[in-house]
Amino acid sequence: TDDDIPMNEGCLKPITIILPDDCMLQAQYPAAVIAGNVETSQIVTDTLYGALGVMAAAQGTMNNFIYGNDTHQYYETLCGGSGAGPDFDGCDAVHTHMTNSRLTDPEVLEWRYPVLLESFEIRDGSGGAGKYRGGHGVRRRTRFLEPMEAVILANHRIVPPYGMAGGDDGAVGRNWV
């Protein structure tokens, strides 16, 4: 294909996906559908890119991190690595697919909320190795300065993001309390 064509309506032509009734993408009551748009969309996008040979799996999750107490509440999505492609490395520490958002600047986060961002760094070695390397994820350590409840909704904690064209899988994510 010619990758140098200008953006036009043909580039945005939708595809039709035919699904069986009562599957993960067409859940029927009383199936649990929490985070149906956030986490499922990441898996669907990675699956489509993989099937088309466009790129290996990205972090495959929005890493939805929610915490708070009666006074303060905060919700953020944490970045990770993007998948490598047939002729390019993945990017480190980026939001991918549906996430497409920015993190709050650490100074603003600490000013607005009773938290201390102790570290935020690239997790070296977490991107899948290969001729073209998958992007590395991150390590983020947050200290609560007041009692808080916290929840993380994330994928790829057991099954790693898949590699492509002989490349290794990426590392699974980890959550520590």
Where would I find each of the regions flagged by the language model?
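Glycine/proline-enriched, intrinsically flexible loops and inter-domain linkers
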Residues: T1-V177
